[in-house]
């Protein structure tokens, strides 16, 4: 390839990467818009307990983790673009299930069941979307810029959470759950149309090691990622109820604060994992996350809680790409999609387990206790990361 063609190819790939990331933003609004609303809908409108709130939120992540293997194989064997577009379509179907839950004149258990069906479909769609877009982006710009690909995808995801949380509460309070569901149904279809003309990358060929051998290569960074994920899971599941229990307003803006600092860190410092390696960046990030969660635990006012959420977002921001760089180093190219899917599955498991367990903890010890549990998990994550990579 000539120097001229390289100069034209790199901007073209970067523009395609931007289009993919923007489509992720649109699609992930199906997660961001309902995230602060579902706890209120389940607890206040349907009359269920904190544990059921945790199940309603967390079950999506179990669906995601159970389909990560399929998503990775699909991306590796049949192409990442197919996986990504399939995920966008599935996320739109989740909105349709929630629309039925809102409009059908049925009992609370049936509405809850439809809500759960939508969450399961969303989990399936999310696994296809994120595994597909990460593998697609790596195919466009190359593994040496894996940190950039993960950073851009993360900015899209948490930008959607930052924008979606207050917007979701606004739509719900003014127009109801049906309007929220309809919005989440339309946005992924717009993303699908936006990405339709982005060039696909070829599926990888070559000998494929078994799934368990891939897991054996990635479990150390995966465990660190899982322990980080507890903090976001408790914020996403219980922050709305925490604010309501204290008589505070602005609950939706906690996710805006979290997502805003998350995106800002990716913009300003997303290059660090590629430059300095993942382990150092991950340890510092986990320290910042711990500080934010402790602030949420002790917050005497809504404003202090917002600062805690912002600090937590800043801490969580670089952990996925930081430890993800270590994953890409450890696996052959033909199973990169499977490896990234498996790596992300550790976070999905963390999200899925945290919701119900934190619900039991909140009922027994109060809502602040879940943020203390998140901080303890982050500290354990620091120890695990240091011990796991001390020879690396």
Curated annotation (Swiss-Prot):
Secretion signal, residue range per the UniProt entry: none
SUPFAM superfamilies reported for this sequence: MFS general substrate transporter
Membrane topology designation: Multi-pass membrane protein
A GO molecular-function descriptor: transmembrane transporter activity
InterPro entries per the UniProt record, alphabetical: MFS, MFS_dom, MFS_trans_sf, MFS_Transporters, MFS_YfcJ
TM regions (residue ranges): 22-42, 46-66, 97-117, 121-141, 151-171, 174-194, 224-244, 252-272, 276-298, 342-362, 369-389
The UniProt record lists the keyword Cell membrane: yes
Keywords for this protein: Cell inner membrane, Cell membrane, Membrane, Transmembrane, Transmembrane helix, Transport
HAMAP family for the chain: MFS_YfcJ
PANTHER family, alphabetized: PTHR23517:SF1, RESISTANCE PROTEIN MDTM, PUTATIVE-RELATED-RELATED
Name this protein carries in UniProt: Uncharacterized MFS-type transporter YfcJ
């Amino acid at each position: 390839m000539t120097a001229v063609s390289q100069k034209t190819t790199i901007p073209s790939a970067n523009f395609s990467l931007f289009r993919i990331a923007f489509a992720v933003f649109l699609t992930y609004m199906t997660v961001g818009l309902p995230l602060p609303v579902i706890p209120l809908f389940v607890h206040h409108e349907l009359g269920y307990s904190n544990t059921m709130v945790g199940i309603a939120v967390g079950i999506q992540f179990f669906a995601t983790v159970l389909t990560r293997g399929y998503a990775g194989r699909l991306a590796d064997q049949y192409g990442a673009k197919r996986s990504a577009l399939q995920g966008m379509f599935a996320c739109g179907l989740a909105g349709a299930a929630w629309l039925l839950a809102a409009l059908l004149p049925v009992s609370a258990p049936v509405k809850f069941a439809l809500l759960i069906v939508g969450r399961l479909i969303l989990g399936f769609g999310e696994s296809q979307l994120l595994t597909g877009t990460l593998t697609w982006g790596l195919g466009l710009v190359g593994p040496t810029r894996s940190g950039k690909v993960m950073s851009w995808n993360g900015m899209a995801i948490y930008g959607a959470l930052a924008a979606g949380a207050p917007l979701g509460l606004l739509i719900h309070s003014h127009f109801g759950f049906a309007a929220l569901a309809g919005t989440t149904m339309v946005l992924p279809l717009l993303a699908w149309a936006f990405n339709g003309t982005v060039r696909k990358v070829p599926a990888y060929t070559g000998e494929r090691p078994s799934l368990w051998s891939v897991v054996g290569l990635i479990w150390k960074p995966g465990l660190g990622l899982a322990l980080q994920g507890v903090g976001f899971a408790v914020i996403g599941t219980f922050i709305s109820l925490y604010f309501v229990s204290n008589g505070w307003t602005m609950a939706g803006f906690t996710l805006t604060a979290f997502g805003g600092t998350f995106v800002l860190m990716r913009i300003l410092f997303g290059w660090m994992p590629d430059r300095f390696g993942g382990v150092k960046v991950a340890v510092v990030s986990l320290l910042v996350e711990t500080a934010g969660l402790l602030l949420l635990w002790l917050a005497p006012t809504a404003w202090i809680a917002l600062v805690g959420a912002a600090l937590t977002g800043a801490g969580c921001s670089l952990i996925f790409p930081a430890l993800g760089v270590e994953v890409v180093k450890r696996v052959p190219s033909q199973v990169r999609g499977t490896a990234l899917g498996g790596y992300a599955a550790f976070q999905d498991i963390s999200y899925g387990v945290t919701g119900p367990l934190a619900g039991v903890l909140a009922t027994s010890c109060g809502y602040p206790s879940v943020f203390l549990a998140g901080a303890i998990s982050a500290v354990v994550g620091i120890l695990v990361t240091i011990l796991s990579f001390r020879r690396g």
